[in-house]
Structure formats: structure tokens, C-alpha cells
Amino acid sequence: MDSQYETKKNDPNAIMPYPESNDEHVGEVRGLGGGIMDKEPEAQEGHAKFHRLGWKRLTVVLIVEAIALGSLSLPGAFATLGMVPGVILSVGMGLICIYTAHVIGQTKLKHPEIAHYADVGRVMFGRWGYEIISFMFVLQLIFIVGSHVLTGTIMWGTITDNGNGTCSLVFGIVSAIILFLLAIPPSFAEVAILGYIDFVSICAAILITMIATGIRSSHQEGGLAAVPWSCWPKEDLSLAEGFIAVSNIVFAYSFAMCQFSFMDEMHTPSDYKKSIVALGLIEIFIYTVTGGVVYAFVGPEVQSPALLSAGPLLAKVAFGIALPVIFISGSINTVVVSRYLIERIWPNNVIRYVNTPAGWMVWLGFDFGITLIAWVIAEAIPFFSDLLAICSALFISGFSFYFPALMYFKITRNDAKSQGKKYFLDALNMLCFVIGMGILGIGTYAAIQDIMDRYDHGKVSKPYSCAPLA
């Protein structure tokens, strides 16, 4: 322990690891008054509480983070890009994201003190890197919560036929309340219990969508054989339109942003490999089958999300089945950002364990505040969905691609056991870096162009509008 404190003294930017459960200093945390509370039982209990995650539950929470209703936007991406490019991109991006998640896992094992993605910025670039990535991390997570508020609003509107004139703001408020309530459990081991419901929900919604669209198409003139799907991109495809479709596929694999946060709660972090491989293969299967099958059943007129193509009645059924995934997948982002902020503000305070009255008050306050901010942003910005696309291009390109490449070159490169393997990994990580830069540049351009097109066609709504979104 003396060497750790000497390291901190010599390097102010060093991130010191949290003490392990058998560390004699585990209880030496500060209370509300700032004094040391020697070997406090709450600290020992709290430390154990936040180290209960095994690889199976890690897989579940990664699924909650990664697989949401956005998977039903992939048939629309396939309709734009064509069946062959769609399948190649879906499988290829999935394999690349499995690898970049592996790099993130290796980085966590080499630097156990990294508790959230922002911390790796300090390891690689010092304080300025920490602050920049922290800003990206918090903003993107809050925007994702906001997107689930809007998705919930659309869902309620579809199920209730827009509530016979009910203001859509009411549906937004109801969605925000549900997101807040589901974010109350502070540990990911607890969230994983909801994750099983989440996974069954999205699988059932996808299955209903595929069956319903298949039946509708088979009953039309000419049957399934008459559906005009294509192997190749549609004619007159613009760069912006094409890259938005590519972005929908890329962003479907954007689970890396929360991987450090989840791994920090594992009791055996080295088991992460099982989780990322399992998740990656599940995602590749679901996304490729969903995108390809629904596009083949509906054709170029497929709606986004695709369950809207299932017909009025079955769209309501599918949305109802998907209700858990809309809110559980959204609430986990609130948990991640709340955990990060509390651990940043009170790194040595028993509050961060959320097992005292003061800890629970702070936790509920952060959950409520983040959900409120997400709702306000989602309702106040008329082009919020497009702004989310810009932020995703700016930030997820880093979290999933070029930051892991930089981690490899700055942290894990020397772990390669042979020169040939090192050269291969050098090339692979250069490819990841180039992909990230391409998404950053072209993706941002495509999202901005889409906003301009929507303004030109009068498709941008007003702030806090009561108009139905469904």
C-alpha cells in the first residue's frame, strides 16, 4: 500500500485502485462529515455488493445495453444498402466489435483502477483526456436515455391510437417515470435480473414482427416471391442516405461504452472473454436474421422500426411485447452515468456504496435528475433524433473503434507473443482506427445533411409539441 501512495504522490494523474475485499483498508472511507470511518461495516458490505457479477450476468447486462428496439431498424438499413452489403456489414461489424471489446477487456485487466470509460482517458492522455472522454461518456448516455423517452412515447401512441387526442407530452412523462423507477437498483447484478425479461421481450417482439410480415406478404398478390427486395443498394442512393443506413448497423453494436463500468463489478474480471464472445455472436445472429428476413418479407417499403410494417393490430401487440426492452434497456444507461458521477464526486465516501440513508438519497436524486434532463432535452430539441445521430457519430465512433485501437497501441501492444502476431494486430487496429475516423467524419456529415433535408421538407417538429409521434 505504501508504494501505491508513493505512486499517487509522484503522479497526480494516477488512478489508484479500489481496495479489494480482503484489503485491510477496505473500511477506511469518509463519512458525511469528512472524517475517516475506520473499517465501517457499510463499506465492507458495499464493496461486496458491487463485486457480485459473474460472466453470465455480465453477458445479460451487455445484452440489455446492446440489444434494444433499434435492432428493428436494421431491415430499413438492409432496404437501403441491399441484402448482400447488409449481411456483410452486419457480420463484419459484429466481428470487429467483438475484437475491440476484447481490447477493452485486456486494458481493464492491465489497469484494474479503470472503473468507467472516462478513466481510460486519464491512463492514455492524462487529465485532459479524462475530462474530454468524461464529457463524451455522460452526454451520450443521457442522450440515449432521451431516445428511450421518445421511443416510449411512440409506443404508447401506437398502442392507444394516440390516446384519442392525448398530448404526446403525457406519454413522454409516463415514459420518463418508468425509466426512473427501473433505474433505482444501483448494482448491475440487480439489473441483470431485469435483463432476462428484457431479452425475452426483444426476441418475442422480433419473432412476432417476422411472422406477421411474412404472413402479410404471403397473402398479397404473387406471395413472397413477388416482394421486390434486392441484393444490391437501391438506385439514386445518396452518400448521406447510405451512410445513415451504415450507421444504424454500426451503432447496433455499440455496447463497448459501458463495458468498463460492467467489468468493474465482476468478481472474476478475466472471465470477460466468455461474455463478449457470447454477446457478439448473439448480436450477429439476431441483427443479420432480423434485417435479412424482414426485408425479404416486406421489401423496400419496410418501416422503421420494422414492427410498424406488421399491420395496425400486430404492431400494437409487438409494441406491447417490446415494452420491457424499451424501458429496461434505457434505464441501464441512467444507472451507468449515475454510478460514474457519484464515484467521481465521492470516491472515498460511503455514499458511493448506496447502502445508507444518505447514499440512497443521493442515488435517487441523481437518477431523478438525469432522467429529467434526458426528458427535457428529448422534448425541447425539435430534431433530437438527428442530434442523437450526430452525437453517436462523434462519440460511439470513438468508444467502439478508435479509442480501443489507441488502447492497443498505447497499452496492450507489447502483450503479443510473436512478431508476426504483433504485425497482424497492428494492421487490424489500424483498420479499427480508420473505421472509427470514417464514421466520425462521414457519419457526422450524413446526420447534419439529414437535419437540413428535414428542415427543407418541413418535417421538424416544434419543442414540447403535443402532436403525435406515432
From Swiss-Prot:
UniProt record, GO biological process: amino acid transmembrane transport
Chain intervals for the UniProt region annotation (Disordered): 1-21
Pfam family, one: Aa_trans
Membrane topology field: Multi-pass membrane protein
Ranges in the topological domain labelled Cytoplasmic: 153-168, 212-236, 297-316, 379-386, 449-470
One Gene Ontology term, aspect cellular component: membrane
Statement: the UniProt record of this protein carries the keyword Transmembrane helix: yes
Keyword terms of this UniProt record: Amino-acid transport, Membrane, Transmembrane, Transmembrane helix, Transport
Main location: membrane
Subcellular location: Membrane
Side of membrane Extracellular, spans: 1-56, 99-131, 258-275, 338-357, 408-427
Signal peptide (residue range): none
Coiled coil, from the record: none
Record InterPro entries: AA_transpt_TM
Residue stretches spanning the membrane: 57-77, 78-98, 132-152, 169-189, 191-211, 237-257, 276-296, 317-337, 358-378, 387-407, 428-448
Amino acid composition bias (Basic and acidic residues), ranges on this chain: 1-11
Gene Ontology molecular function terms on file: L-amino acid transmembrane transporter activity
Family classification: Belongs to the amino acid/polyamine transporter 2 family.
Function field: Required for the transport of neutral aliphatic and aromatic amino acids via the N system.
Protein's name in the database: N amino acid transport system protein
Organism whose genome encodes this protein: Neurospora crassa (strain ATCC 24698 / 74-OR23-1A / CBS 708.71 / DSM 1257 / FGSC 987)
